[in-house]
Amino acid sequence: MNTIHHLSQYALQELKDSYSEHEIECICKIIYMDVLHYTNIDIHLRKNEILDESFINKFIGIVRLLKSGSPIQYILGETEFAGLRFKLSPSTLIPRPETEELVRWVGEWLKPGNRLLDVGSGSGCIGISLAR
């Protein structure tokens, strides 16, 4: 179990009771992109290359945390929202796709020079996304 292909198969076997096959593929892709800094193309081109043992151990640890119910966003400590990366911790809420849609709508509604106050923002994703 030392290539992307093998690790993805391992994750599929370990997480199949909690996630769909498509969700597991997406989670693996997120891990490869976040930890290895691979692009989507790298993942496919390098799927049979031997990986560093430290990454393999980290991957297995992430799968164990996922299996215990921890969200991938908390495990990695960040998430994407409205095209931006945000730091997260268990004390902040994970932004939802519905919130991202709301931010898009409000962004279209706001006019230059409008002021907006974001109170109790948690990760700050709403206010920061609207400010840019």
Language-model regions: role of each:
Residues 57-132:
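SAM-dependent Rossmann-like transferase core, predominantly class I methyltransferases
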